[in-house]
């Protein structure tokens, strides 16, 4: 339990930050899910369009350090490879 005024304030701030970060992580997961659905549907044009939007979301959230920059880079790379594989298939 937070005993000092400073600790109580930090606890309040942490709670607000946690809920805000959870919202952003949810937005990220939704963006990635949309790309994967377009890939599974086999629609390369739609997948590329949604991929561009999800890259913007990934970069924005990685800049805020909500997810690690390497995780964002890895996710972008894997999704991009899957979209390129659609052209070959």
From Swiss-Prot:
Protein name: Small ribosomal subunit protein bS20
Pfam families found in the cross-reference section: Ribosomal_S20p
Entry keyword annotation includes Chloroplast: no
Listed InterPro entries: Ribosomal_bS20, Ribosomal_bS20_sf
UniProt family annotation: Belongs to the bacterial ribosomal protein bS20 family.
Region (Disordered): 1-26
Function: Binds directly to 16S ribosomal RNA.
GO cellular component, one term: small ribosomal subunit
Name of the encoding gene: rpsT
Keyword Cell inner membrane recorded: no
Keywords: Ribonucleoprotein, Ribosomal protein, RNA-binding, rRNA-binding
Gene3D superfamilies named in the record: Ribosomal protein S20
Superkingdom per UniProt: Bacteria
Entry's Gene Ontology molecular function annotations: small ribosomal subunit rRNA binding; structural constituent of ribosome
PANTHER family, sorted: 30S RIBOSOMAL PROTEIN S20 (PTHR33398), SMALL RIBOSOMAL SUBUNIT PROTEIN BS20C (PTHR33398:SF1)
GO biological process, one term: translation
């Amino acid at each position: 339990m937070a005993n000092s005024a400073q600790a109580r304030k930090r606890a309040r701030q942490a709670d607000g930050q946690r809920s805000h970060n959870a919202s952003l992580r949810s937005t990220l997961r939704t963006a990635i899910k949309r790309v994967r659905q377009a890939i599974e549907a086999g629609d390369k044009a739609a997948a590329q369009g949604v991929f561009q939007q999800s890259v913007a979301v990934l970069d924005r959230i990685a800049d805020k350090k909500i997810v690690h920059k390497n995780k964002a880079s890895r996710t972008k790379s894997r999704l991009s490879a899957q979209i390129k594989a659609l052209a070959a298939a």
